[in-house]
Amino acid sequence: MRHFAIPTLFTLTLVAGCVGEAGGKAVVAGAGPDDLLKLRAGPGLGYSVIMGLPDGTAVTRRSCVTEVGQLWCRVSLTTSPGIVGYVSADYLSAR
């Protein structure tokens, strides 16, 4: 039971932290000056890329899910709210 409780608590803490920010503003950070963060059709690397987002792109978090040990957030672009997709939470910074 002890081995199960600690990873579960850690995962719930990560997800709760992101879900608590649903509707919160964030910016893309850490993609690098010559790279783009991929906005995907679903939460994982197997989903198609909708578009690339440079560092500094403003987004609104909608929700977050864990997929294969990676936290993914469903976001919309602040300047174009109709554009919605998933990005790795590792590349989002609170605004």
Identify the meaning behind each predicted range.
Residues 9, 90-91:
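Intrinsically disordered, low-complexity segments enriched in proline/serine/threonine
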Residues 18-43, 51-55, 62-65, 69, ...:
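SH3-family beta-barrel domains
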Residues 2, 38-40, 74:
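Basic side chains
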Residues 53-89:
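SH3/SH3-like beta-barrel superfamily modules
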Residues 46:
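A short beta-loop-beta micro-motif enriched in histidine and acidic residues
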Residues 1-18:
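Sec-dependent bacterial lipoprotein signal peptides
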